[in-house]
Amino acid sequence: MPFGTEAAMERDKNQLISVPVKEQPQLPYLAAINPTGQKTLMEKLGILSDAAKYDVSCSSSGVGRKGDGTGIGNTVAGGICHSFGADGRCISLLKILFTNECIYDCKYCINRRSNDVPRASFTPDEICELTIQFYRRNYIEGLFLSSGILHNPDYTMELIYEAVYKLRTLYRFQGYIHVKAIPGANPLLVQRLGMLADRMSVNLELPTAEGLSRLAPNKHRKNILTPMRQIQRGITQNKEEIAVYRHASSFVPAGQSTQMIVGATPESDYQIMMVAENLYRKFELKRVYYSAFVSVNADKELPALPGGPPLLREHRLYQADWLLRFYGFEADELLSEQKPNFNVLLDPKADWALRHLELFPVEINRADYRMILRVPGIGVKSAQRIVRARKNGALAFEDLKKIGVTLKRALYFITCSGKMMYPTKIEEDYITRNLISNKEKLPFGADGMTYKQLSLFDDDMPGWQKIAGGTL
């Protein structure tokens, strides 16, 4: 039987939930979560949208889910962002936790069990109503749903599954849905959610198992990697089934992602990039997110951050990650055990080029695509345009500027028809000084944050304020 058939989903669902979800309008746990006299829906929304802001592992996915005309919603392959502004601007993704209750006591987490913070939990029906009502008002295009662990992983995943199942079936919502898989939950629940969600993610939390055991003693690396492997195999199997069964249901069509906290444990950039590279290779992840550690708890195991969160380090990791995914670099080309951390003054690509000046200057009219990609100041689109344009004749520096090459960075590393743009010394110190003088524009806001989830409620937020680092 195909992996993604409705019959398989119904069979697996009934093994865990004896009564079909659509026949369960009232369940015992709903009263336990929200008895009469507890928080209103708007109070819950305020608490649980704010609690979700530390999870950065969501943004646009590139997936398209075309509505079939029988329901509501349509996923456009792009433009899915973090949240929306109080002025009605579509930032487009309702990003909330199902609950910030949690049985775990992770030292770095604001929602840890021992913290005295306002607690709240949605019901599946409340999640559905919020999503639909926000969608109808054109505030969002989709839903990002994560959660603390309520009672146990299976219990939490069943609640999440019920919410997503109702959205897709009862409410006929066909927009984008990104769901967090809970480590340690029953694999059948992961499989069933994968048939309904566009993207799933399992947070790695910390780069190494040692760091995880020290700061999150209730979590285990194996429990995190198991659902990641299951999702990867499910995606591969689903692609094979769709090739044979044209109408087979899709399984996590936008792929999976993960997130690592940077700076909470002493791992080097080299260790972090090696972990990321292995995740891309072994688990075929679409994206690894890096979150600069923000100190929200007082704990002796957590590092002191007199300079604030390591935002520049996070930025360099994202730049290096881009080089791994789109520029053909490998982690051990960028860093090594002898040079374990990125240069804070130079981006990783320029730093690599300066350490390999024997390969430069590159002759633009003859170099292969791979080498052109490695020139600082030349991006993927510019490299593709160069390869196409030079078929029609030799390119000059004026042509490169029109193509989109950043010449103030590239001029030290390229020639056109054997000539450099200006007489330039191919010396590391000289080029470094000139590159540093061209101050790099870092994606930090006025408050030093690399990203910002807009409030659902603050009416005094300037309309021009933008989210930094919000594209995928």
Model-predicted regions and their roles:
Residues 301-373, 409-461:
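Long, highly charged, low-complexity intrinsically disordered interaction regions
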Residues 93, 106, 145, 202, ...:
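Conserved, mostly hydrophobic/aromatic
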Residues 96-125:
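Canonical Radical SAM [4Fe-4S] cluster-binding loop centered on the CxxxCxxC motif
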Residues 132-147, 320:
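Short Fe-S-cluster ligation motifs
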Residues 128, 151-334:
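Conserved AdoMet/S-adenosylmethionine-binding subsite of the radical SAM
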Residues 94-96, 125-136, 243-244:
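Short, charged beta->alpha transition segments
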Residues 1-101, 406, 414, 422-472:
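Flexible, acidic/Gly-rich N-terminal and inter-domain linker regions that tether
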